[in-house]
Amino acid sequence: MSLYGISVIPVLIWVYLLLGRGRFWHVAAHRPAVLPPAAARRVVVVIPARNEAAVIGAAVASLARQTFSGPIHLIVIDDGSTDATAKAALAAARAAGALPRFELLRGAALPNGWTGKLWALSQGVTAAAELSADYLLFSDADTCHGPTSVASLVADAEANDRDLVSHMVKLSAATPAERLLIPAFVFFFFKLYPPACIADPQRRLAAAAGGCMLMRPKALARAGGLQAIRSHIIDDCALARVVKHSGGRISLRLAEETRSLRRYASFTEIGAMISRTAFAQLRHSYLTLAATLLGLFLTYLLPAVLLFIGDPPLVCLGLAALVLMSLCYLPTVRFYGLSPLWSLCLPVIAIFYTGAVIHSAVQYARGSGGMWKGRVQDA
């Protein structure tokens, strides 16, 4: 293939991404729905926590003060924390007057074959079985819910007959590293998992955002329970997959009022977050890794390279691809309240993500993949 033929590829890719792929780029926050009192449901929230003393209090308080017509019971599983996680969670529940509907569990030792988070969640699900919940809400210890978050999730599930409803929480974009890389993380996630395709029962594609997942207990049981995915490091997408493939209906939306309390002060921290699961996403295939790197080059880097070739037709092709790229990314940039100029940064961002993906593969090869809170979870 000639250089001109190769240079057309990025333009074709971005035309497809703009017009097809479920319009994944059309970012719009899910507006909370008002839940009619007659549709009140019992919700049990399960929060796994390991060394989260800095954020667990705010997470518990946000759930204890929900505007919701049904009962909400909170279960926090302290997964071997060495800090004051348990004390902070208990203090927050007490301050919110939620102790009668709050339970703190000390996590049992991690058995072989389980990831830490899924083992903690499993213990919470076992405890929740005694409460006859209509819905289980899996929430991360660093997720701060908006006041109508639970009502919105339940209303979504009831109105649209969903077995699993997931809201991707709004991630922090305060530091320079976050502003450059975090909106792109959301953009890439939705490009891989377009919400319209996730919600379509005729498609097998499935995904969820682990920070905020509401599901019916019967759907979880039908899918084989958490034991069915016990070793999966990308547990949220694995859970969505077994629920959907067992006949469940799922949906994935973007939340605005519910946000993550986790901050990434440096590029190193964000790189570690990405590389923790990147190679697992590729199913530990070096062939898929090579194809992914080629795809990243053709999609994001080649358009920028073409600007410096000096050949007018090639420059025009590169410019066309960059314009389409920016148009796709712009709604995500706006959602995070950033200048539209950030939409021009995807080629630079792609270089960083390429490095993180390679680093993830190297970590896996060294037997230290999926490092999280002192645990190697992908080796």
What residue spans do the PLM features occupy?
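A conserved acidic beta->alpha catalytic loop
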Residues: 69, 78-88, 108-109, 143
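Short aromatic/hydrophobic "clamp" motif used to bind/position activated sugar donors
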Residues: 121, 136
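Membrane-embedded multi-pass helical conduit in multi-pass membrane proteins
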Residues: 288-368
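N-terminal membrane-anchoring/stem segments of glycan-assembly enzymes
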Residues: 1-37, 182-183, 195, 353
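Catalytic donor/gating beta->alpha subdomain of glycosyltransferases that bind UDP-sugars
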Residues: 157, 163-191, 218-221, 226-288, ...
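Acidic donor-binding/catalytic loop of UDP-sugar-dependent glycosyltransferases
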Residues: 84, 139-156
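Cell-envelope/extracellular polymer assembly enzymes that use nucleotide-activated donors
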Residues: 42-44, 73
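Short, acidic, metal-binding catalytic loop of nucleotide-sugar glycosyltransferases
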Residues: 61-71
